[in-house]
């Protein structure tokens, strides 16, 4: 008899927040979603939840990976005074001691100067690299300010490719 193999269904209201359903999804791998008229309107599985988490988390993780790559490029190449020169004007109370104290825009300000770029010893086009960094900065601002539209495919793809590019530079010993 099929009834003997059944287990109780795990049901949540369609109005319940996804966050509150996480525990049930985690424990049982799914929840059934119940409409106000008590009909079952759908199912949310652990796989659905994992994919949604990946979509939301991936941009943050990629931006972090890219920032770490840029910091690695800049590490030990500049004095604290030179790093402070990249600071946004009027931000005098902030002290910059290492590349990790710079904002993303300040990375761009620092390396767009030819004299600073030369110190990095990267055999790639400065304007192209700075342009890509600037695009990362723009995407980063959308990501960090929780753009309700999320990240479009082109921006996600760009972040993945740029993170991979920095990884290749590291793998070949360029940084």
PLM-predicted stretches and their roles:
Residues 1-10, 45-48:
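Bateman (tandem CBS) regulatory domains
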């Amino acid at each position: 008899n099929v009834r003997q193999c059944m287990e109780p269904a795990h049901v949540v209201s369609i109005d319940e927040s996804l966050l509150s359903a996480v525990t049930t999804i985690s424990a049982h791998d799914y929840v059934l979603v119940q409409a106000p008229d008590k009909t079952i309107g759908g199912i949310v599985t652990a796989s659905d939840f994992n994919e949604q988490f990946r979509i939301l988390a991936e941009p943050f993780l990629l931006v972090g990976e890219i920032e770490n790559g840029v910091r690695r490029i800049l590490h030990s190449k500049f004095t604290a005074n030179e790093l402070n020169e990249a600071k946004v004007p009027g931000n005098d109370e902030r002290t910059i001691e290492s590349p990790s104290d710079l904002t993303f825009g300040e990375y761009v300000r620092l390396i767009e100067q030819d004299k600073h770029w030369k110190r990095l010893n990267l055999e790639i086009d400065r304007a192209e690299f700075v342009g890509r960094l600037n695009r990362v900065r723009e995407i980063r601002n959308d990501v960090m300010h929780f753009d309700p539209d999320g990240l479009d495919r082109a921006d996600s793809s760009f972040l993945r490719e740029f993170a991979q590019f920095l990884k290749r530079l590291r793998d070949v010993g360029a940084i």
